[in-house]
Amino acid sequence: MNRKNSRWTAALAATLLVQIAAFAWLIVRYERVASGGTVCRFACEAYDPSDPFRGRYLRIRVRERVDYDAAFRLGGVRHPYRLFPAAIRIDPAGGSNGLSRVTACGLEPQGPGLWATGVKARARYRNYSGKDDPPDYFEVQLPDQFFLNERLADEEGRLFTLSRTNSVAVYRVRDGRMVLSDIEIDGTPLNEYIRKRRAHP
């Protein structure tokens, strides 16, 4: 019986170690991108206040669209409503007001430029008659969860909602990976913005 318990304990310990190592690797990989990646900035909208995970992160929405380019391979992904995993090419400073711009979308990186993989996209049509129709453009969905201090979540959420017309999502891109590293309100990082509001209510 003791030997059986020892084996069970060893198996449980090994499982926990694997989970801890995997979690640690995710953190290391995130920090590597967040600290050394190319900065890309997109206008964003506030999270959904009915989100059941409110208090753990803010949910944002970035609305980006890019015209269809027949040179970029799509395979069979043409359904007008279905999201598909995509790669996007980004011009970090190609948009208006110092924002970034998505310049291409495909199933995988193709050609030079700053590419981010693992994002979602949806084909859009002005007139859809069948699966062989080329889309007119793509809607691109970027990472949308910004994790934060739970004690400040409600306050950050209120401030973010009130200031959403001047909100910018700051991403970092490195080696094809894209992470949401910060949110700016009126050009100020969210945590700093809150500290200033607290100091001068």
Residue ranges and their predicted role:
Residues 66-127:
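Structured domain cores in non-transmembrane regions
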Residues 42-74:
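Short extracytoplasmic
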Residues 29, 51, 63, 164, ...:
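Extracellular/lumenal and peripheral-membrane lipid-interaction modules
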Residues 100-104, 116-201:
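Extracytoplasmic/periplasmic terminal helices and flexible tails
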Residues 22-44:
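Aromatic-capped interface at the extracytoplasmic side
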Residues 7-29:
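Hydrophobic membrane-insertion alpha-helices, especially the h-region
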Residues 53-56, 74-86, 155-167:
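Short nucleic-acid-contacting surface segments enriched for D/E, G, S/T with interspersed K/R
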Residues 1-6:
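Short, Lys/Arg-rich N-terminal segment immediately upstream of the first membrane anchor
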